Amino acid sequence: MTRYNPREAEPKWQSAWDACDAFKAIGPSASNNKPKYYVLEMFPYPSGRIHVGHSRNYTMGDVVARYKRARGFDVLHPMGWDAFGLPAENAARDRGVHPGAWTHDNIDAMRGQLQRLGLALDWSREIATCDPSYYRHQQAIFLRLMERGLLHRKTAKVNWDPVDQTVLANEQVIDGRGWRSGALVVQRELDQWFFKITEYADELTDALEELDRWPDKVRTMQSNWIGRSRGAEVSFPLTDSGLAEQFGATIDVFTTRPDTLFGASFLALAPDHPIVKALAADDPEIDRFMHECARMGTTAEEIEKAPKRGVDLGITVRHPFDENWELPVWSANFVLSGYGTGAIFGSPAGDQRDLDFARKYDLAVQPVVLPPEASADTHVIEDEAYTGPGTSYNSRFLDGLSTADALERAITELEARKLGKGATSYRLRDWLVSRQRYWGCPIPVIHCADCGVVPVPEDQLPVVLPEDVTFDHPSNPLERHPTWKNADCPKCGKAGRRETDTLDTFVCSSWYFLRFTSPWSEDTPFLASDAEHWMPVDQYVGGIEHAILHLLYARFFTRALNDAGLMNMKSGEPFAGLFTQGMVTHETYKSADGKWLSPEEVDLRKDGAVEMSTGKPVSVGAIEKMSKSKKNVVDLDAFIESYGADAVRWFVLSDSPPERDVEYTDSGVEGVWRFVQRLWSTVTSLPEGAPGPLTVAADASGPALEIRRAAHKALHAVTDAIEGFRFNSAVAQVHDLVNVLRKYVPSDDAGIAAKTEALGILARIIAPFVPHLAEECWEHLGGEGLVIDAAWPEADPALLVEDSVTLPVQVNGKRRTEVTAPKGAAQDVVQEMVMADQTVQRALEGLTVRKVIVVPDRIVNIVAG
């Protein structure tokens, strides 16, 4: 029989699926009584090419989509493009191509790659967030949420590159310098737009408990990011009457540990706190410190990594529990004005950051919480703070109380003294969505000198990006455009100015899953009836790197749109199930001069790796996730050209649990290719005239019955594995079944029927994984229509009962193989099974069987000579 040829089979079956719109979702209709199932992978950014690492995400979602379709569901499995973003502008600068042209060329290329991968996608619903037909509705959503008070504009700090004259994202600041210019970055305050996500902080936190089909790790990450915590607002009276008159009588601080107030040894203010700014005007040291901090990175990670630095402001405050106790006030680089009040009190014995700061500047360290089992006489704090619970001591009226009781008692005392109160605080801040970029969704407002900020009327949407822009200067092209920003005020008709900021691309990805439910809707972002039918997404698949921002913003948006009346979902949760897949990894390679090399540029020899173009030695580095920056990617098209799409799919699902990384190796790929051929040869080994693949060999007995039993057990196990997202387990079950079927050579019609039934089951259970090969097998077996239209088989419970034993088979005392037989099977039945085994037959070639010894349920020994 000929070998399986994916170059012929895969285009053939993809054309067949396209011809009948096989994967087009039906949606809500009176004639559709199928249950719905919405499966979605996080849509890609069209960066140019999809590599093998990317394919794992889409393949996993595709397995679920195809499986659910076979189980009788009406499946929505769409695809689109997260198409705005900075890389397109960088390409415009570096290559002289318009961002739109670059983006759409990439979309065309990547769409072709996904189609060649054989994904069961409903392409009729394809969207791209850079198309005006999409962002028109995003602008309408912006105006609706603005009307509801969920948007506001205020000044906020940004990273400003003084050479490129542009705002930089945090990741574009490297060691305090702009990534392109190398200039020292400074902090600037600009007017920015914010979504009031904080208004949903409690709801977003509480609802995490309901997401029982999300990974615990992701729920914990979101909970920590929102950071709801019970504590107290504490007021420290200023001792300087002049400052008190100018800035208020107290410096207010939020703390989660008011029980440690008696361990306080200092207050610290953010470098840009109003009091610090006022004092800096007359103190060069404070002024210098303030400006040095303005050049620091602003992410929590950067702040945490930076050495702790501060400056004594030369002022003091009174302790709220003792008016005779004065605490020095410092400014510290680890205090941020955007968090809380921009002020903290330092209790060094109970906080590592405070302890590091106190040791550096020789501030007092007073332990106030005694750990369990510790002694007050011997407990000391040296280089490590104690942050856990315990018993209060050195704390006057709190002495002897547990941490929980001391916290409540401290709040009661603060409230009695009118110097504080119990409060709940959140780490979450309102979502800054302004970007000083061209390639993004325009913000639909006009600035008028008389009327202020005026929304663009909805009948004038979309506000479309101008095409005639240049990228010869790094600043925002919209700001420099000679005419686009000029617009009349919709209220008074006077000359106004368009907003030249665009929206954060996370806004685009915060509602795209809703647009997929009715992408043809012209008057509304989506049809409420369709959204209510399809939502929530039943299974969402994507990387752990999106665990916080994207998923949190999407949860906020769904609630906000629900509350705005655009739909009436029972739950505000957009994703009922979430799976975060592992990466595909690969060795990394560096040339002798330190440049990253792709696998295609390296010759792996027994005596070491060399660069093909130079013959020079190559350094083989760590196995890391495939990334373009390190060039350790394997091109998807090249893989498909060599081995076929099904081999890609099978490889990325094999060996490793889907939540873990899987390593790309040439040997692993070759193993997959051999298995594909082995499976095909097993299917084509049936004799001509065999019955069709829906055969049920109900009368099978002996070896034929065991073949049926193996097939139904594999069916049951694969079904269970897919339902549990254990795709590697399903792959292993298929391997085992193929091995069993290869060894079985039927000797009569009952055996042929049993093997045909088993192969029919095999063709259907591999269809979600290797759909082209499954179609080819189904056709060869004589199946009617397409295998994707065949119902998922049901395992016969009677065949799942464990009533068989595995018997080792020896030939002349040497173990050759093993067979599975019914418990207590008669010796002649076991002997027939053994003699039909191909491995046994090969071992007996040229020999005469003299005796077959069957020890019931134990072992079989063949004596031959």
Swiss-Prot record:
HAMAP family (UniProt xref): Leu_tRNA_synth_B (MF_00049_B)
BP term (GO), one: leucyl-tRNA aminoacylation
Presence of keyword Ligase: yes
Homology family: Belongs to the class-I aminoacyl-tRNA synthetase family.
Species this protein is from: Maricaulis maris (strain MCS10)
The protein's Enzyme Commission number: 6.1.1.4
Main location: cytoplasm
Protein name: Leucine--tRNA ligase
Entry keyword Protein biosynthesis: yes
SUPFAM superfamilies, sorted: Anticodon-binding domain of a subclass of class I aminoacyl-tRNA synthetases (SSF47323), Nucleotidylyl transferase (SSF52374), ValRS/IleRS/LeuRS editing domain (SSF50677)
UniProt cross-references to PANTHER family, sorted A to Z: LEUCINE--TRNA LIGASE, MITOCHONDRIAL (PTHR43740:SF2), LEUCYL-TRNA SYNTHETASE (PTHR43740)
Enzyme class (EC, first level): ligase
Residue interval(s) of motif 'HIGH' region: 44-54
InterPro entries to which the protein is assigned, alphabetical: aa-tRNA-synth_I_CS (IPR001412), aa-tRNA-synth_Ia (IPR002300), Leu-tRNA-ligase (IPR002302), Leu_tRNA-synth_edit (IPR025709), M/V/L/I-tRNA-synth_anticd-bd (IPR013155), Methionyl/Leucyl_tRNA_Synth (IPR015413), Rossmann-like_a/b/a_fold (IPR014729), tRNAsynth_Ia_anticodon-bd (IPR009080)
GO cellular component term, pick one: cytosol
Motif 'KMSKS' region: positions: 625-629
NCBIfam families recorded: leuS_bact
CDD domains per record: Anticodon_Ia_Leu_BEm, LeuRS_core
PROSITE patterns assigned: AA_TRNA_LIGASE_I (PS00178)
Binding, ATP: 628
Record keywords, A-Z: Aminoacyl-tRNA synthetase, ATP-binding, Cytoplasm, Ligase, Nucleotide-binding, Protein biosynthesis
GO molecular function terms attached to this record: aminoacyl-tRNA deacylase activity; ATP binding; leucine-tRNA ligase activity
Catalytic activity of the protein: tRNA(Leu) + L-leucine + ATP = L-leucyl-tRNA(Leu) + AMP + diphosphate
